[in-house]
Amino acid sequence: MNRKSQKEIQVTTHMVRQFLQENEDTGYRDFHSNLLPGVDNVMGIRLPVLRKFAKQLSGMDWQEWFEQADDQWYEETMLRGLVSAYAKMECKERLTYVAKFVPDVNNWAVCDCFCSTLKDADKYQIEYWDFIETYFTSNKEYEARFAAVMLLGHFVKREYLKESIRRLELSLIHIS
């Protein structure tokens, strides 16, 4: 029998939503929804479960799903961020996916979780430092938050300290 390799398996919206339905936890949904003001599309899947599934998806053919997803559920948005952060790829390609994803971030949980999962920001400091700069002056709340969380999560280092403070001040002035 000829089995497909993981990379040959096409991720689909149907596949993702079926997983979400199978792992829905209404008790957790009620709890988690209270932490997300203004977000009313929570199914209630715990983050460790989403992370495990995202790691599986990141080894498959996920790019078309990422591009075409309509993010009906909060967890779909979270998965798109996690998959793009976990997938093996060069820094330049990842930053392309990050740039596509950041405008879709619409709450603190997706923003903060996504930023903390972008582990290659520690390896490619210069590339990420340059990349996040424009987000500090964004008029969009979660784009500016993305920049601040990335800075605090990956750039609190002596060599970036002065410029980090300047960028955070710029961001505060811009959103005031």
Give short role names for the model-derived ranges.
Residues 1-172, 176:
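Alpha-helical scaffold domains
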